[in-house]
Amino acid sequence: MFSRYPEYATPVGFARAEVRDASRIAKPLLIGRFIDAHRHAGFRVADIDPLRLAACPDVPELDPGFHGLAPDEPLDTPLVGFETARTVGELAQRLELIYCGALALDCSGVRDETRRRWLFGRMESTASNPVPSLGQRHAVLGQLLAAETWERVVAERFADAKRFSLEGCESLIPLLTAVIDNAGRHGIVRLLLGMPHRGRLNALVNVMDASAADVLARLDPDSDIAATQTDLPYHLGATTRKRTPHGAVTVQLAHNPSHLQSVYPVVVGMARAWQDAHGEAGCLPVVVHGDAAFAGQGVVTETLNLVRHAGYSPSGTLHVIVNNQIGFTTPNRMDAAAHVYCTDVARGVDAPVLRVNADRPDEVLRAVAIALDYRMIFRADILIDLIGYRRLGHSEHDLPTLTQPALQAVIGAHPGVVDLYHASLGGTAPLDGLRRAALQVLLHGHAGAPDSARHSSREADATTTPLAELSLERLRRLTDALTCVPPGVRIHEFIARMTARWRDTVADEAGRVDWSFAENLAYASLLDDGFGVRLSGMDVGRGTFMHRHAVWHFQDGGDRVGAVHVPLGALSAGQGRFDIVNSPLTEEAVLGFEYGYSLAAPEMLTIWEAQFGDFVNGAQVFVDQYIAAGEHKWGCRSRLTVLLPHGHEGVGPEHSNGYLGRFLQLCADENMRVACPSTSAQWFHLLRGQAAARQPKPLIVMSPKTQLYGDARSQSAMTSLLEGAFATVIQDDSVTDAMRVRKVVLSSGKVHYALRDARDAAGDTSIALVRVEQLYPFPRLELACVLGTFGNLEEVVWAQEEDVNQGAWRFVRDELEAVLPGACRLTAVCRAASASGAHSSVRAHQAEQRRLVASALGELAPPAGGHAGAEASRVGAVERVEAAAA
């Protein structure tokens, strides 16, 4: 592992107690403790703040006297890595240069001894290296000038435009350029970049090769492109192909909203998808963060922990903190005395931090080289904390002197990095001339770039393979593979009974297919056709309701403890890729990851399943900003499938509601599909159709829970899997005389079966029960055709289990009015509006359900076995709403 780098002595334990009697301790040990003190604590006094406003604590361990050593004391033998030091004083100077300069190492969160040794070795070996060549330094100066010039041009032309200036951290541009060059050195061919809006426009032009004229036009309120763009320019992504001395690197800057840090899991999901398809060695995720957001946003901590799990690891991410030491108007200063930094959340995941002064570009480049080497060797996260300042306010509409007058006075007197770096180069051409040249390059040099960036380009459509024809023989073959037990393995009795039932089912064309079997057969048939399937979420291997059983845990004990068999991964040699990943207990990071995965793997069926649909609101940012709006804003097409177990069963407001109404409120422009299948065959066809759709769209499924999974009436015949496709509307096949029907009750989901039981028990042939299986895009034509078959129809009722302020009613009302035949009246029967939602009493829930069904089918009658008191008042909370009055 270390063949490319020199070996260094293993650091000894860190000494915290002052040495009072050095004569009793061997001198090599004292020197080792002195060196170790700098390795572990030197960053606390390092010269990493350009403004030098951060408090510098007294760290006595960094003084030779603390260890009983005198500065003029000779070193008896040369020290590996410090051969030029002849005395303790010279050693101290050397250690200060290495660990207390403009680049400092913080490995306080790294518990792995091997990684710490490597980091110490790299710091000690590179500190003596000569600065970059004059040519390299001139190139860096050019990059800094380009960054500075961009900010000045935008400020002059569009003084009122928000650009989220990079001024104070312009070194980010040479940093990102160096990352790309170093990535090429390591054989990276795909670099996935995520970053917030601070400095993004600058990076689009100066890193992503975007046309300056194009970006300026997006800022011009009078331009045609500004009038037609679907998102703000500092949210847009781009893709470019960069040439490096070691080969070409394709760099993709991911689109993202203003919701800070949300793009982080998206980028690592995209990276993992690329790695799964092409090999993990060729792809690098790089995420740029703001200091306040990195410390403050929970999605950061969730994702840092998520990627430590094998199913979500992108083999290490390079993090870059643009640390301007302030968040909006709130100071976010380093506190070395209290050991408080914006990167502290990364200590929990063993990530080292390279802290570097943004006014020292040469050290910035050294930090990049060390960080990339570390990531490639250890396949682990590492952070570069680029410490600068914010010359202007949060945005150009801000007046920072209102809240930070003293800080702004210091910043106003501080020279820019271009001036400082130009001065360090000595005999370089006059700066005024260089700035004029940089302006010409900016205005004229990007438009004709041969590898110009593609902005807001649509993600490539999936090259889907048509679904192969299904036959009973094929399903039997797949069932044999699904139920095959590896030789010598003992499986759980429950699994044995289940697989026996599946074999019996497929042996009979009229056999009833349970939901678990239908889902597994859907995946198996897709995999057999060469499609890939990825399914992740909490407990997805077994399923929250013991409804999937895609992972079998061996019951043998002994050396088989923990061993599993995944039947869907062992169907045949030529099958598609199947991944099933039990996620940690997080929604936000996982949903963001899977969305990113779906973008980079459009040919795969990528699925996230919530433990209960209610918990999807823990990931609301990704629903609102990415899934619902990503295609319209950025052209990002995704076939991500979101399964939300949904339905009122008397288990309370936290385990009943997939927020159907909220999803429907987000529906527009055919941005996604929302479905609520009521049979196992529908479930089977829905999943297969989603995988094969030529134009990918996200699919939101109000999926079954315990009652529907166990309802035998929802289990379709085996022949239903062989025929047809997903039906957006299901007709009432029990109606024998359509002219007798006076009322049609429409519903979606399991409430249909409660309505059917009550209707059939009453023997009422004047009521037809029609299921709307897809709620968006709403099947107007299909439903109009069904309703048109009932020539004497008087009333259409929409019945839903959900409260009137939730569920589908307020969305479907306009759709139903558009297809209502003649003089029919439209009403809705729902639970009454409620702030919390479902009832937590099973008895009260059942009484509510009976009253709801009775109201939907006829006159509002008291439920059988009704009770007085609080329950009765809740039972009365069923609303029958006339559409015109709603």
Labelled PLM ranges:
Residues 3-6, 12, 31-41, 45-98, ...:
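Glycine/aspartate-rich loop-and-adjacent alpha/beta segment that forms the canonical ThDP
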Residues 428-533:
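Hard-cation-handling environments
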Residues 314-433, 636, 648-659, 706-886:
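Thiamine diphosphate
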Residues 128-150, 216-268, 272-276, 694-761:
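Active-site cores of enzymes that catalyze phosphoryl transfer or operate on phosphate-rich substrates
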Residues 527, 541, 560-744, 748-750, ...:
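ASCE RecA-like P-loop NTPase motor cores
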Residues 189-350, 354, 545-601:
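Cofactor-binding active-site loop characterized by glycine-rich and histidine/acidic residues
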